[in-house]
């Protein structure tokens, strides 16, 4: 484990509760008016594993994450987090869940009026027993780990897309979560930054066993990260126990998805 990760203040989550699976979807259905997005979707994510959810745009990848965070409610089926059924949780109950599970949004979702340092420190505002000096020291450690220390005094509007993502990950880590959800972490960044994001997520996983779900259409990233793969197509989920199993599937929709990803180069080169 690298020294910066050792000193980051993050803790190993491999020895949490007795629940083997941190996330479970059991026959989840979701429709918006007549448009069915999730149809009897079931999958499990083991504690400490990284699950990659793949599929074309609009198939329900991000919708799945929003169900976990309590931003959307399933029409039917069950969702379990750390062995606890959260399907019908209230907003107040989900506030507790969000202290354990954080989400890195595609947009970064940073506060425009706050500096990078203030954005990273935001989840720590209500932490009992932390002095201002404690918060500053912790933010500095996270900034070093995420390699964003050079921009701590800048506003989000002054950052590149890739740097905003790195800051968003730092803010997500500030509350030392048990699990992290990543929504398209490499979209609209160039290959170098995409590789950096993959390195970072992999380091966090290997060092601290954070349970993760990564929504992406980036097969290069997915291949590096995936312990298991969920492929969404027409509202239904196919679950694969490894990337090799996913890649060797003969399903025509899946083969076409992989082929298109190989043939179409990344068009977004904005850092």
Predicted regions and their residues:
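Helix-to-loop junction immediately C-terminal to a conserved catalytic motif
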Residues: 69
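Conserved ABC ATPase "signature" region
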Residues: 84-85, 132-150
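ABC ATPase NBD coupling module
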Residues: 86-102, 132, 246-250
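Short coil-to-helix segment of the ABC ATPase nucleotide-binding domain corresponding to the Q-loop/switch region
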Residues: 114-122
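Conserved ABC ATPase signature
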Residues: 155-159, 163
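Conserved catalytic motifs of ABC-family nucleotide-binding domains
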Residues: 176
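Catalytic Walker B motif of ABC-type/P-loop ATPase nucleotide-binding domains
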Residues: 180-183
